[in-house]
Curated annotation (Swiss-Prot):
PANTHER family registered for this protein in UniProt: UBIQUITIN (PTHR10666)
UniProt organism field: Glycine max (Soybean)
Name of the protein this chain belongs to: Polyubiquitin
UniProt keyword annotation of Transferase present: no
Subcellular location: Cytoplasm; Nucleus
SUPFAM superfamilies assigned to the protein according to its UniProt record, in alphabetical order: Ubiquitin-like
GO terms of molecular function: mRNA binding; protein tag activity; ubiquitin protein ligase binding
Record family assignment: Belongs to the ubiquitin family.
SMART domains named in the record: UBQ
Any one biological process term the GO annotation gives: protein ubiquitination
Keywords assigned by UniProt, alphabetized: Cytoplasm, Isopeptide bond, Nucleus, Repeat, Ubl conjugation
GO CC, alphabetical: cytoplasm; nucleus
Amino acid sequence: MQIFVKTLTGKTITLEVESSDTIDNVKAKIQDKEGIPPDQQRLIFAGKQLEDGRTLADYNIQKESTLHLVLRLRGGMQIFVKTLTGKTITLEVESSDTIDNVKAKIQDKEGIPPDQQRLIFAGKQLEDGRTLADYNIQKESTLHLVLRLRGGMQIFVKTLTGKTITLEVESSDTIDNVKAKIQDKEGIPPDQQRLIFAGKQLEDGRTLADYNIQKESTLHLVLRLRGGMQIFVKTLTGKTITLEVESSDTIDNVKAKIQDKEGIPPDQQRLIFAGKQLEDGRTLADYNIQKESTLHLVLRLRGGF
């Protein structure tokens, strides 16, 4: 029967094979056609790397199936894995290695079972079935290893009503995960939750470890009420604009709402409250701006200073 082999360059090779051919046989045929030594070939089908001793039939590869050929570079590449204790492990890998493979190599070196490993790169937790290439992990990249402790740890979440919720979490849980756990316990949709720790609002994609939230830490849950609150903005002409906002809105957000209503670009707006000019990155809560507060809008003239 005929099968196709597609290379990373997009070239497609046609091979005459039989179901009983082993992967070794197929690699030998590719060598005959393309001159690529078998030890530099990795063949992938249906997302799985094919093992030399197995047959095409073993993998249910039928006529006109397409295999993908990835080149195994001689010597592969080195990457580093940094643990929370600060220790750095060096691994020999290839771009086509899966995250499972990498965890197995870490187990070989350090004795840590894969199911207790979480690998992070560029702020993202890496999924087992994906490859290093999928995450654009290149030579000498550094991954971060977070241990998934059996049983994790407990943290507390205190609501504005004074109620305290206990959650079972792990350091590597993201804020999204924590909000999902709160939803499971309390029925509050994640998009209505804002979590605060050490005076900072926590961002969804970050982990508890990123914020140094440890066992028995207490987070504060503020509800993002639909409709929030009203504030007023008074212009120099004496006109008053009413805005729907939330305490956690930033000054940038408020300027964008003013632009929507009045057409004034944010870079021409200066907002004043209690004699202070308000800074873009700060929130209304930072300035203790509450419902029905009045801000003053001064226009920053083009060409001004």
